Design a protein with these regions (language model features):
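A late C-terminal transmembrane helix in Major Facilitator Superfamily
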Residues: 152-181
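C-terminal ends and interior cores of transmembrane alpha-helices
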Residues: 105-117
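Juxtamembrane intracellular "pre-TM" segments in multi-pass secondary transporters
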Residues: 8-36
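Helix-to-loop junctions at the C-terminal end of transmembrane segments
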Residues: 81-95, 179
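Pair of pore-lining "gating" transmembrane helices in MFS-fold secondary transporters
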Residues: 29-50, 127
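Intracellular juxtamembrane helix-capping segments at the cytosolic ends
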Residues: 135-148
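Short amphipathic helix-loop junctions that connect adjacent transmembrane helices
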Residues: 52-71
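C-terminal membrane-cytosol helix-exit motif in multi-pass small-molecule transporters
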Residues: 1-14, 201-206
Length: 218
C-alpha cells in the first residue's frame, strides 16, 4: 500500500479510433504474434513443468523438505526480483535479444540437470529456470503489443493468454507422470531443446519480415 501511495501513475490515455478491427485469424497469423505467443507459452510451460517436477525429483533423490523449500524459494526470487530491471534491459537491448538470453538460460537449466543432481545443482538449475522465465515471458508480453491496434487489443491479448495458460495447465498436470517415467535428468533433456524453439521462431520471423518488423500504429 505504501508503494502504491508513493507511485505516480500517469492518467489513462484516450483511445483513438484506428479503423475497424481485423479478423482474429489475420492477427494470429502475423509472424510477430507467432513469436510472442510461442515465446510466452514455451517460456512459461518449460518453467512450470520443471518447477512443478522439482519437489518430486528432490524427494525421490532423498532431500528433506527444508532443502526442497529453499530450492523453490531461490527459484521464486530469480523469477521476480529481476523484474525491477527487466524493462530497462529490454528497452536497451530489445525484446528479441532478451528472449534469446532467456531461452539460453532455460536451456542452461536443462543442461545443468544433466550434469549435477546435488543440492547446489538443484539450486543453480532452478535459479537459471527463474531467470529464463523472466527474460522470456516479460519481453514476449511486450512484443505482443506490436501486433494489434487499439480496437484489437482485447481479442489479441485474450488469444495469447488462452494459448499461454492452457499450456501452463497442461504442464502442471504432466509434471508428475513425466518426472516419474523420465526422471529429473530425462525430463530436462526433453525440455532443453524446447527452450530453444523461440530462437528458431525469431530466425523465421527475421526471414519473413526482415530484421525490423513493421509495428502496428496505435
Amino acid at each position: 500500500m505504501i508503494v502504491l501511495a508513493l507511485t505516480h501513475l500517469p492518467p489513462p490515455q484516450t483511445t483513438h479510433n484506428d479503423g475497424p478491427a481485423r479478423p482474429l485469424l489475420e492477427i494470429l497469423r502475423q509472424p510477430v504474434f507467432v513469436v510472442a505467443a510461442l515465446t510466452g507459452l514455451i517460456g512459461y510451460g518449460v518453467m512450470n513443468l520443471a518447477m512443478t517436477a522439482t519437489p518430486l525429483a528432490m524427494h525421490r533423490a532423498g532431500f528433506d523438505f527444508d532443502h526442497v523449500a529453499t530450492t523453490i524459494q531461490w527459484h521464486v526470487l530469480a523469477m521476480f526480483v529481476p523484474s525491477f530491471f527487466t524493462g530497462y534491459l529490454t528497452a536497451r537491448v530489445g525484446a528479441r535479444s532478451m528472449i534469446v538470453l532467456g531461452c539460453l538460460l532455460l536451456a542452461g537449466c536443462g543442461a545443468l540437470a544433466q550434469l549435477s543432481a546435488t543440492l547446489h545443482g538443484y539450486y543453480a538449475a532452478l535459479i537459471l529456470l527463474g531467470l529464463g522465465w523472466n527474460f522470456t515471458f516479460l519481453p514476449a508480453t511486450g512484443l505482443l503489443t506490436e501486433t494489434y491496434r487499439a480496437s484489437e487489443k482485447a481479442r489479441a491479448q485474450a488469444a495469447n493468454e488462452f494459448l499461454v495458460f492452457s499450456t501452463v495447465g497442461m504442464t502442471a498436470l504432466l509434471a508428475g507422470p513425466l518426472e516419474a517415467s523420465l526422471g529429473w535428468a530425462g525430463l530436462n533433456a526433453v525440455l532443453l531443446p524446447l527452450a530453444l524453439v523461440p530462437i528458431i521462431a525469431l530466425l523465421w520471423q527475421r526471414l519473413a519480415n526482415g530484421v525490423n518488423s513493421p509495428q502496428i500504429r496505435h
